[in-house]
Curated annotation (Swiss-Prot):
It is found in: Cellular thylakoid membrane. InterPro entries: Psb28_c1_sf (IPR038676), PSII_Psb28_class-1 (IPR005610). Keywords: Membrane, Photosynthesis, Photosystem II, Thylakoid. It is a peripheral membrane protein. One of its GO terms (biological process) is photosynthesis. One of its GO terms (cellular component) is photosystem II oxygen evolving complex. It comes from Rippkaea orientalis (strain PCC 8801 / RF-1) (Cyanothece sp. (strain PCC 8801)). HAMAP family: PSII_Psb28. Transmembrane segments: none annotated. Pfam families: Psb28 (PF03912). The keyword Thylakoid applies. The keyword Thylakoid applies. Part of the photosystem II complex. This is Photosystem II reaction center Psb28 protein.
Amino acid sequence: MAQIQFSRGVAEPVIPDVRLTRSRSGQSGTATFYFREPSIFNSESTDEVTGMYLVDEEGEITTTEVKGKFINGKATDIEAILIMRSPEEWDRFMRFMERYAKEQGLEFSQAGQS
């Protein structure tokens, strides 16, 4: 099962908006995730954000570049950035996203496609 987690072992049910960029050479890329009101910020949650973990049957992709957005002193949103430094890392990320999208009933579309 493909999951996104902010605290190890705790799946985040909120589906993010994901923006991808890739270098012209294809050697590197960036995925920026935006989570609006993620469940980890619920008042019942005592879990701490320790990073963003993309977990599936192949293993785990991790980033610690995770920022919270605060309004009136209350955490509301999360932005996480995953940098891929090789074509292999990009391919691995895309395999995760295909699994995640399929399980969540989402579709992937590239910019410029109709």
